[in-house]
Amino acid sequence: MSDGKLLSAFEEELRKAQSLEELKQKYEEAQKQIADGKVLKRLYKVYEKRQTELMLQQYRQIKAELEKRKKVKKKDKADIRVRVVKKWINSRLFSAEHYVALLQENQDGLSILFLRRAKLIENQGYLMLEVKKLRKAWVLTAEPILLERLKFPFGKKFVAVHFVLPNYPYTLQLKPDEKLKELAVKAINGPQIMSAMIRTKFFEALARVGSGPDLMMLIIGVVMGIGIGVAIGFGIANANLTHLLSQHVTNTTVTHTTTTTTSPSFTIPSNSSKGVS
């Protein structure tokens, strides 16, 4: 059989190929039987054209299959009902003056280092407290102690006190008695009520802080009107705050009762098995 007849026969065979594998096998058979380079070049053009057609056909099949899978996924997503529960943040938190009470670990537990003004900022969706002078920031994960005080010449504003540790990036959670918390937030003289309730611990706090910058910062905190109860009172609860450093300590409640002449008796719970006398 001449090369011309072989070319026509193999061209017909290549055009009838239904898969890339079949097309490749027939082209290899033609290469073995045809020796003329010009004839092979013409045959290669037929081979290349059919190969493109088969690849395009295969591509369209894959594309159609992928579109079906996408539709199934979209339908599955539509069938899933997600209920988003939005936690409303207390609006008073944004209008309040923010202070961080920096605590330090020692042999007895925790003691307050100082009280410093902080700025409430938002960073990558997180509310954070930033103290630029210290070059430190803490993520707001706990409710602060909110105090209400009068604003000259009229009105009122809130003071939020957050408890933090130097090397711990989150604020600490303190849960005061609900009755005390209600008074501290709603009462006009909230700081005075709180300080009166723990005034008996004032000298104990001074004894633990000692003298120097720490004592000066505590006095400044009181003078600024934040109240002894916040500036000093919580700083003396070394044993009560020790459990905050551990994630696996079981919290217990010890009740302390202090009676004053200006207000009825309240209870201040402590989250430790050690009581404060």
UniProtKB/Swiss-Prot annotation:
The organism's place on the tree of life at top rank: Viruses
Region of interest (Disordered), residue spans: 256-277
Pfam family, one: B277
InterPro entries referenced in this protein's UniProt entry, alphabetically: B277
Role summary: This protein may be involved in virus assembly. Essential for virus function.
The name this protein goes by in its record: Uncharacterized protein B-277
Organism lineage: Viruses, Viruses incertae sedis, Fuselloviridae, Alphafusellovirus
